[in-house]
Amino acid sequence: MGEGAWLVAFLVVQRLAELALAQWNTARLRAAGGIEFGAAHYLLLVALHSLWLFGLWMLGHDRAIDPLWLAVFVLLQAARLWVIASLGRRWTTRVIVLPGAAPVARGPYRWLRHPNYVVVVLEIAVVPLALGLPLFALVFSLANTTLLAYRIRVENQALAWAALATSNGGSVKAGTVANGYASSFAKSVRTAKNDLRHTNR
């Protein structure tokens, strides 16, 4: 196999290992009363990363790896492990919060709100650049940024509800959180409809 093939093979094994860990943590979080937000977008996220890996294999399996970009990639893997270790059992590929649990404030979370997404954004671009695929890097960076922008909005909502539960001494029930989120969304829709109705008058 070429250098590119070894790199993509490493990424596939890494992603499978992360999915296994994420499923384990997700089950534990749900058993502890965790609430999932934005579940509908999860399959899109999986599809995007699957297409990214498939495209890297098809276009880059026989390419050499640029040593400079490879060094950046290695640093990103160290940052990824730091994030996972900092979140511990709360690390997952889904957006899940525990009502009443304080946000993680150790590791890179002392300085960044979403360090994991910083790693993902950079990795999506760095790997194809390491294989000499700048257009591929641009296309998937744009797609990934669009999807992450939505995911970050969802996660910020989830963190806001977690903070609400914490301020109530952990007394906010799972159903209350979920219903409150749904009510907030429904209210936003009604407001938008009313604004549109007034505009058309």
Regions found by a protein language model. Give the residues of each.
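N-terminal signal-anchor/start-transfer transmembrane helix
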Residues: 8-22
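Long, highly hydrophobic alpha-helical transmembrane signal-anchor segments
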Residues: 39-65
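Feature marks short, highly hydrophobic, charge-poor N-terminal signal-anchor/signal peptide-like helices
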Residues: 1-3
